[in-house]
Amino acid sequence: MTKTNDDIHVNKKYKDTVFRKLFGENKGNALSLYNAVNHTSYTDPDDLEYTTLEDVIYMKYKNDVSFLIDKTLSLYEHQSSYNPNMPLRGFLYYADLYRKLIHRSERLYSKHLLKIPRPHYIVFYNGSEKDLAEERRILRLSDAFETDTGAGEYEWTATMININSGKNQSIMDSCHVLYEYAVFVAKIKRYRDSMELKEAIDLAVRECIEENILRDFLEQHRREVCDMCLTEFDEKKYEDVL
């Protein structure tokens, strides 16, 4: 147990996040989010196969959800801080994902072309709008190259989707769980400006339950959600002063 500046005891075993619990443990929620992002209409959650990696050393805490559906390998992350290195993180993550898939097939050295699922990397962002004011932004790995490799020679992207209030309304309308999650996080961020973090989280949870926002989820996992938020938001506060 670690004592923070706000005199909050943070349990460091909680490296999972609310985003991952919502979308990484419920195929129905993940499918709804996929449909909203891709303008599809899949109805059977069993069409979706989770591929989320565990214990990824370059990820500080688990805000990632990966799954396979319709020959597309999706990686979704939530970020409340702007990070220009997301394309590199996604590149490394996908290397591990494809390594697992190729090991399963054991055809890497075949004379025939080995077909792989199409990658689709999305970062859901609800941090400061000073860093991302537009609804979407595509981050490119080539921006990190120390020398110019030539247009189109190699590229890897991360698509940032802004889920702050008033942004990407069509996605929010199509995936109500994402909308409710964004409301919940926004409440915590707003309340922590005027009270201690633990009080802000408790108030946000109570209000969301009263307003029927993630009610069943919060009632069922209230203690765990509070612990995850304490860890995530406390680490976010520390990162902001670095």
Please report, for each region that a protein language model flagged, where it lies by residue.
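Elongated, amphipathic alpha-helical interaction scaffolds
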Residues: 1-242
